[in-house]
């Protein structure tokens, strides 16, 4: 890691021995371990260990779960909120497990579209609900800091499975709950 940063500092014209930079390689290495710890965790385990047989057959919504991730194209952050709705069949998941699922997938190099899809597909596979919907809203620093430089742009993605995809009324109910 130190060799990488020494080359990086040289390439941008910076003095690697400058006081403020001496510990930077170590600090960044620790930061990267934290930012990308999602590679060392299995998202399926997070859900499998946190569900129980339930009697609820109405919609359950976990709204505005904050996340941050790193764009795999530019290695810059993107961040925002994810909302997950589902209609149980037999399994109800602990609410913190939804946040954990989001955290595991977001702590990897990502694109927003794949992040949204991975959350929905894993939830659908493990919990087997009658339907699941995932909506992700994010700001991308790669869009704000370079290229088109649009600081206020918000990107929205959604993935729908089961009843949310088949039934417009179910989808509308979820969207109404997000507004309230």
Curated annotation (Swiss-Prot):
Any GO MF annotation of the entry: zinc ion binding
UniProt keyword annotation of Hydrolase present: yes
Matches recorded under SUPFAM superfamilies: Tetrahydrobiopterin biosynthesis enzymes-like (SSF55620)
EC number(s) on file: 3.5.4.16
Catalytic activity line of the entry: GTP + H2O = 7,8-dihydroneopterin 3'-triphosphate + formate + H(+)
Protein name: GTP cyclohydrolase 1
Organism of origin: Helicobacter pylori (strain J99 / ATCC 700824) (Campylobacter pylori J99)
Keywords from the named record: GTP-binding, Hydrolase, Metal-binding, Nucleotide-binding, One-carbon metabolism, Zinc
An annotated GO cellular component: cytoplasm
Pathway it works in: Cofactor biosynthesis; 7,8-dihydroneopterin triphosphate biosynthesis; 7,8-dihydroneopterin triphosphate from GTP: step 1/1
Cysteines joined through disulfide linkages: none
One biological process term in Gene Ontology: tetrahydrofolate biosynthetic process
Family classification: Belongs to the GTP cyclohydrolase I family.
Superkingdom classification of source: Bacteria
Residues holding Zn(2+): 71, 74, 142
